[in-house]
Amino acid sequence: MKILVCGLPGSGKTWLAERLIKHIKNCAWYNADFVRKFSNDWDFSVEGRIRQANRMKTFADFEKGNGRWVICDFVAPTEKAREAFASDYVIWMDTIKEGRIVSSKLSELKNINNLPFDANLLSQSKEFEDTNKVFETPSKVDTHITHFMSDDEIKKLSEELISV
């Protein structure tokens, strides 16, 4: 099963993904920030976002093709990006109304040596602002999350995913 966890920056995508994989056996996890880092691709144009969705799809399809579950967490701001990824299941983290880079993410980015940008400046940049502007409400959502879930709620969600 290929699961997309999407939503605005700071909505809790990574937070949820890292908790879900603890309850799903044989499950890979790909985080967009790490995939971008290792690809050294920091293009947030429409084309760059589609390329990132296709890159995430490639990793996810590899895992799924080898009989594994996979969770990918990334903004996937447009229907086109979500369609390019072609998930089996969509979790929309609708916990905030405007994306932001949370302080823990800024701290994490500071420890990456090869970033071609200043993380603090990115959080105030046009590209980051554009993410809020271009984000389209997903038309296909299997689970719509509007709050940060408790451990029990996350376990229940993982059980629901396994039974799909």
Predicted features and spans:
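ATP-binding Walker
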Residues: 11
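Glycine-rich phosphate-binding loop used to anchor ATP phosphates in small-molecule kinases
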Residues: 46-98
